[in-house]
């Protein structure tokens, strides 16, 4: 039994390596950082978007062979336009940050960058997953019972 | 992308300006400002989560090891283990319920009820789940086909599809239909033009004789889901090889398969990301795709690797899945091993593992 308990603790410690937010935890963090209604985008929109982009995994990374860019973090923000990873051709870095900043457990910088993205004319439509899963849907379930 | 709509409406308001220079400057600034998607998640959308009226062939196909864009399908293990029940193991759901569900699956896989899973049993299960994904695709295809065949004559032409595709990209459906009817050049951006070209190639490939560019419902299914059509699977393989093949010899070397973009990585974390990506692809290349281990992947090898109904692949996959969780190395899976490695099988940790097992004893 002791061995199993030790195993359990090891599992717990292993899970700390990659910060994966719980849905409501994420919603509260967003609200605390002024995301509710930012540029007309509701909290539920942001939660829905992040679930479909990264399943709330702060260290999600996906490479895009097409333009040799990479999408980083809980919002899957792209290195071609928004951040610098030192290896993306024709990069712009509109958020003025290294892409590694988007992978941190503390998602403050990722939120600031997401705000910058949504201030562009296309707004939240910059996120394909939002268009395909969240647009014109009833999103109340994404923040249900979160107290936000 | 929808940003074209914004440009169109903005262009109208700019037409009133007298100075052409200002109009051009505005256009250039607008193009630069609006053509910046947050990411390219399009290529990674799960097929199971597609909208009902989805008419664009997905890059991601459930139960297929490589995406259409050459990425490894990181959800493959869960897809062939869970079948269409992939959404039942959300992080939010209670651990006890997830555990019970996992044990129900275990008892189904364990055909001879000896309380452990053999490679043969897992292989059989994988084949069953893969077929399940295909049945799901057939069902979805009826809806998609109905969306592109509104007159219900059982055929959809390339021109009809093009109208629907561009409408789904935010273009005005009537304007597009008129332009096509009058053989006018379509005003679409470069990226959409390229996608259309690829789609047209696939359309040609899916169009069985007679070559009339009209697709039936079955042909449309192979257009959206090439993995279960021999001809379309070959086409898919050819596309992937073409994308990755740098020296043009129509096969893939290890460097080609794992190639990363040139450039200096800025820090150690970036280097770690690259290393992980390369390591995963190298392992897949050497251990699985290159079946004769000669350092070269031919189109035939890649096709065998991607064929979801290949029995040899399913057995290999079964052995691989068992090996990952088989702690006592008896080449079988016991209930406690599956529970401990639940994240590998379901994509979701069972955080109360220790407590649950304690209660079981």
From Swiss-Prot, chain A:
Cystine pairs: 24-146, 48-134, 83-99, 95-113
SMART domains assigned to the protein according to its UniProt record, in alphabetical order: LYZ1
InterPro entries referenced in this protein's UniProt entry, alphabetically: Glyco_hydro_22, Glyco_hydro_22_CS, Glyco_hydro_22_lys, Lysozyme-like_dom_sf
GO biological process terms on file: defense response to bacterium; defense response to Gram-negative bacterium; defense response to Gram-positive bacterium; killing of cells of another organism
Entry's Gene Ontology molecular function annotations: hydrolase activity, acting on glycosyl bonds; identical protein binding; lysozyme activity
Active site residues according to the UniProt entry: 53, 71
Signal peptide annotation: 1-18
Subcellular location: Secreted
Annotated GO CC locations: endoplasmic reticulum lumen; extracellular space; Golgi cis cisterna; Golgi stack; microvillus; rough endoplasmic reticulum lumen; secretory granule; trans-Golgi network transport vesicle
Organ and tissue specificity: Expressed in lung, small intestine and spleen.
Domain C-type lysozyme: 19-148
E.C. numbers: 3.2.1.17
Keyword Transmembrane helix (UniProt): no
Pfam families found in the cross-reference section: Lys
Function in brief: Lysozymes have primarily a bacteriolytic function; those in tissues and body fluids are associated with the monocyte-macrophage system and enhance the activity of immunoagents. In the intestine they may also have a digestive function.
Other observations noted: Lysozyme C is capable of both hydrolysis and transglycosylation; it also shows a slight esterase activity. It acts rapidly on both peptide-substituted and unsubstituted peptidoglycan, and slowly on chitin oligosaccharides. Rat has two lysozymes, type 1 and type 2 of which only type 1 is expressed; type 2 being probably a pseudogene.
Name the record gives this protein: Lysozyme C-1
Taxonomic source organism: Rattus norvegicus
Organism placement in taxonomy: Eukaryota, Metazoa, Chordata, Craniata, Vertebrata
From Swiss-Prot, chain B:
Molecular function terms from GO: calcium ion binding; identical protein binding
Signal peptide: 1-35
Record-linked CDD domains: EFh_CREC_cab45 (cd16225)
Chain residues that bind Ca(2+) 3: 212, 219
UniProt: Ca(2+) 2 binding residues: 149, 151, 153, 155, 160
GO terms under biological process: calcium-ion regulated exocytosis; cerebellum development; fat cell differentiation; maintenance of synapse structure; response to ethanol; UV protection; zymogen granule exocytosis
Matches recorded under InterPro entries: CAB45_EFh, EF-hand-dom_pair, EF_Hand_1_Ca_BS, EF_hand_dom
Keyword Transcription: no
Record flagged with keyword Repeat: yes
Residues reported in the UniProt entry to bind Ca(2+) 4: 245, 247, 249, 251, 256
EF-hand domain mapped to chain residues: 97-132, 136-171, 196-231, 232-267, 277-312, 313-348
Source domain of life: Eukaryota
Keywords: Calcium, Exocytosis, Glycoprotein, Golgi apparatus, Metal-binding, Phosphoprotein, Repeat, Signal
Coiled coil (residue ranges): none
Tissues showing expression: A membrane-associated isoform is expressed in acini of the pancreas (at protein level). Ubiquitous.
Pfam families from the UniProt entry: EF-hand_5, EF-hand_7
Binding residues annotated for Ca(2+) 6, in chain numbering: 326, 328, 330, 332, 337
Family: Belongs to the CREC family.
Primary role: A membrane-associated isoform may be involved in the exocytosis of zymogens by pancreatic acini. May regulate calcium-dependent activities in the endoplasmic reticulum lumen or post-ER compartment.
Subunit details: A membrane-associated isoform interacts with STX3 and STXBP1.
This protein's domain notes: Binds calcium via its EF-hands.
PANTHER family: 45 KDA CALCIUM-BINDING PROTEIN, RETICULOCALBIN
Protein's name in the database: 45 kDa calcium-binding protein
Gene: Sdf4
